[in-house]
Amino acid sequence: MNITTYLKATVLGLILAATFNSSAQSNLDGIKGDEHSDDNEIQLTNESPQELLLEYEIERTKNFSNGYKSTNRTTLDNLNTISNRAQLSLAETYEAHYIQYKQNGFTSVGLEFLKNAEQNTENKAELYSDFIACSHVLKKELLFDKYTSKLRNSGFITNEVLEYNKNVLRSIETEASFIVTNGWEDTYPLLSLLTQENKTATQVINAEWILDPEYRKLIAARLGTSNPSFNDNPYDWILTVSQSTSSAIYFTPTLPRSVLLNAQESLTPIGIVFSLNPLTASEQKRQCINAWKMFSKVELISNSDLCANYIFIFSVLEDLLANDQSEKGTLNQVLAYKKQLLKKYPALK
């Protein structure tokens, strides 16, 4: 079985879901923005904090599944309008401060709004990931350590997701490397595990954060490259900077399917990540086997998306080990796990 062909096949379609659940749009049904008067004054009647925040988030993320390209002029104008409504009508609420944090991005001003939001909500745990992102970009290490620890101990991240991300890190052989992530199931668990797994030299690059100009400057500096112009698509930006660095760069399977398919000629499956660096077949095989031998608690995985990622790499390993008698024991173990997961999720066959 040819790996490139396999990458294009239905298994890849199964493991690469769209970034944001399209059902979020249906949650907005019935929520209508207040109409503007003829003189463009905002009508502030019966604003619901929760509905206004939902309206803001849907506007901000509505095109994210299409390569994150959502910072066009109309979108920015709409976000500014919603932000102004929040400031005028919601005053010192969690929702108003959170919207202002999002508007200001990963800046010192944005961080202050985030702290104010935390003071105005009982469910402080829902902000852990925001504090992690903001402190990471602003290089506030004590704050970053504080909130990654809080997140790790919060129970928000299940054991199976933690184990999966331990195996993601064990798929990466070069410590001083960069891994491009996309979602809740990899970005924050990985950040919380770097110290624990002795991978502090590994840099996590979240695709959504690249929309923030300060974050782009930070990543370009860490990659040792110039900061290229930005065309509203973080993946184009990542691929551009990747051509100017010798650093090892990896993609996780949570990235949009279109992105991985477009970059497939440059991607090599290693463990449960994709290497953007060119590798020989023998080197791929060596790294895949090493990653597999370090994998832990695969049997815990019950999430269908995570199972699909494992099934994909098991199929890659099966192909690589098919004619290697010295690795027959490894092959049998791989096949046993694959059979076990397919029995649990027959739709992934």
Label each residue range with its predicted role.
Residues F20, E175-A176:
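Generic detector of short, well-ordered, non-transmembrane alpha-helical segments enriched
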